[in-house]
């Protein structure tokens, strides 16, 4: 990847808001939300700032969705630190910690502090169930390990030995894991009947699927 070019103060404000919005809601903001938060006169002004950030290599704009904004990561920031990097999690065995050594397929030179809150591991995305918020097949999802999650956040959950990325809705003892693709029905988990359900963390960012080629 190319190194990130210096941002103007206003561009940095926009970028910081994008990161904050993804951190707190699990998805990018719309142009209208950016305009409202930062005091732009119209969503068109927000669009111009997004285009500027895209030209500088810090975001990617995806067509076809109002929330089609993806943060990109400059791996060169951690290139001189041999110990820097995030583990990539592969297949997970039921009953074992997700970060157990046997689950780690490799380590990627990514600065964990690029994500807020800090990322603890990467998970490869399979399928198109979250495509409407820009999480695509083959992407690497940056995940912050935590059990402290809120309704509406995009989480990484484990059911037996299956790991899934979905938006959380919990009502009492029933958990609904919602896709961001109308072709997929929610996964419904009754916590009283399914003891092998674990929340592994929240999504804090995406590395696009061709960033390492």
UniProtKB/Swiss-Prot annotation:
SUPFAM superfamilies: LexA/Signal peptidase, Winged helix' DNA-binding domain. InterPro entries: LexA, LexA-like, LexA/Signal_pep-like_sf, LexA_DNA-bd_dom, LexA_repressor, Peptidase_S24_LexA, Peptidase_S24_S26A/B/C, WH-like_DNA-bd_sf. Keywords: Autocatalytic cleavage, DNA damage, DNA repair, DNA replication, DNA-binding, Hydrolase, Repressor, SOS response, Transcription, Transcription regulation. One of its GO terms (molecular function) is serine-type endopeptidase activity. The keyword Transcription applies. Residues 31-51 bind DNA. It catalyses: Hydrolysis of Ala-|-Gly bond in repressor LexA. The record marks 94-95 as: Cleavage. CDD domains: S24_LexA-like. Its EC number is 3.4.21.88. The keyword Hydrolase applies. The active site is at residues 129, 166. One of its GO terms (biological process) is DNA replication. HAMAP family: LexA. Homodimer. Belongs to the peptidase S24 family. Represses a number of genes involved in the response to DNA damage (SOS response), including recA and lexA. In the presence of single-stranded DNA, RecA interacts with LexA causing an autocatalytic cleavage which disrupts the DNA-binding part of LexA, leading to derepression of the SOS regulon and eventually DNA repair. This is LexA repressor. The gene is lexA.
């Amino acid at each position: 990847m190319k190194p990130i070019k210096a941002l103007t103060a206003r561009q940095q404000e926009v970028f910081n808001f994008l990161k904050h919005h993804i951190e707190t809601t699990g998805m990018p903001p719309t142009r209208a939300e950016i305009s409202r938060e930062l005091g732009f006169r119209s969503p068109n002004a927000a669009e111009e700032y997004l285009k500027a950030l895209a030209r500088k290599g810090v975001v990617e704009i995806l067509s076809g969705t109002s929330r089609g904004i993806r943060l990109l990561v400059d791996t060169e920031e951690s290139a001189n630190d041999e110990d820097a990097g995030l583990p990539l999690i592969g297949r997970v065995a039921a009953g074992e910690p997700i970060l157990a050594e046997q689950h780690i397929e490799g380590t990627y030179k990514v600065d964990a502090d690029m994500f807020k809150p800090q990322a603890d591991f990467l998970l490869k995305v399979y399928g198109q169930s979250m495509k409407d918020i820009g999480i695509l097949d083959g992407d690497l999802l940056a995940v912050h390990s935590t059990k402290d999650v809120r309704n509406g956040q995009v989480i990484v959950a484990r059911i037996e030995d299956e790991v899934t990325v979905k938006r959380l809705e919990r009502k009492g003892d029933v958990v609904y894991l919602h896709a961001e693709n109308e072709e997929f029905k929610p996964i419904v988990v009754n916590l009283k009947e399914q003891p092998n359900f674990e929340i592994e963390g929240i999504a804090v960012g995406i590395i696009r699927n061709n960033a390492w080629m």
